């Protein structure tokens, strides 16, 4: 059975489809945790819900094709904070029903990586399939090379997805860079954040309205970062609800933030 260096072993389409559908059903059935941040509650469940990144996710574009053609592969997602790197990694795992493990190169260490190897190995023995390993801030993971990539990557144990805010040509180790496809993510445009605002109001704050001036302030503060935008909206919306305010205006946003 053939695999690429970090990709999945070949398996019947029926198995892939069944696993993917099971993963989607599990996510849909899970209750929404109202204590979690707004950005987490609004995290997209399909690539069609992803805001922005049309150059990668539009019809016929490279990353969308990877989803549609059932071809998870090792990749590096390069872009500023809050543009969907973690979301896309999770969606890749969900789309194919693969387990997902996130490792931070800043907070994690070799022990965390070895634990991930053990979990991925157990999954491989149980299902015959690989695990998506997401390396946060992968420009710092110099020790990943010896601990993970050499002994375990060759076996197809992992489909590795790395996220970086730095230029991978200069910051990512060559062993990783040469075996991964680099996708460049862009800061969200104003219209993307407006779409996100409409979604948040519809799903989470149906009794609230945000006037045009307040909207401009929120978008300006976000600077293309969806997480920052939603955090600011959540603070404003929570204060408005507590005070019985139905329309958030520019004065209220300035006072809240």
Where are these regions (language model features)?
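Dynamic helix-loop-helix/coil hinge segments at AAA+ ATPase domain boundaries and subdomain interfaces
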Residues: 32-58, 102-103
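Short glycine-rich substrate-engagement loop in P-loop NTPases that contacts/grips substrate
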Residues: 56-61, 99-131
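Structural recognition of the conserved hydrophobic beta-strand(s) that form the central parallel beta-sheet
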Residues: 103, 134-135, 159-165, 184
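Loop/turn-to-beta-strand initiation segments
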Residues: 73, 128-132, 155-161, 173, ...
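Conserved AAA+ ATPase "SRH/arginine-finger" region at the nucleotide-binding site
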Residues: 104-106, 181-194
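Short regulatory helix/loop adjacent to the ATP-binding pocket of P-loop NTPases
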Residues: 150-153, 167-181
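C-terminal helical "lid" of AAA+/P-loop NTPase domains
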Residues: 216-221, 227-242, 252
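Walker A/P-loop
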Residues: 2-8, 12-31, 65-103, 118-121, ...
């Amino acid at each position: 059975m053939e695999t690429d260096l970090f990709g999945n072993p070949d398996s019947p389409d029926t198995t892939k489809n069944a696993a993917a559908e099971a993963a989607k059903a599990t996510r849909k059935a899970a209750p929404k945790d109202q204590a979690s941040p707004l950005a987490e509650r609004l995290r997209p469940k399909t690539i069609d819900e992803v805001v922005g990144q049309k150059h990668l996710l539009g019809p016929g574009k490279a990353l969308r094709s990877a989803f549609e053609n059932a071809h998870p592969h090792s990749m590096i997602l390069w872009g500023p904070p809050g543009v969907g790197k973690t979301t896309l990694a999770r969606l890749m795992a969900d789309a194919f029903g693969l387990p997902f493990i996130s490792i931070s190169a800043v907070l994690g260490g070799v022990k965390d990586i070895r634990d991930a190897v053990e979990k991925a190995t157990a999954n491989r023995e149980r299902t015959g399939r690989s695990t998506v390993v997401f390396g946060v801030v992968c420009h710092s993971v110099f020790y990943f090379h010896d601990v993970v990539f050499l002994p375990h990557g060759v076996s197809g144990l992992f489909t590795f997805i790395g996220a970086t805010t730095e230029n991978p040509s200069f910051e990512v180790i060559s062993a990783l860079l040469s075996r991964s496809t680099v996708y460049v993510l862009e800061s969200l445009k104003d219209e993307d954040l407006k779409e996100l605002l409409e979604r948040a109001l519809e799903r989470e704050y149906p009794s609230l309205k945000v006037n045009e001036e307040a909207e401009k302030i929120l978008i300006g503060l976000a600077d293309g970062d969806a997480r920052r935008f939603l955090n600011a909206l959540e603070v404003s919306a929570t204060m408005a609800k507590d005070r019985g305010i139905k329309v958030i205006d520019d004065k209220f946003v300035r006072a809240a933030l």
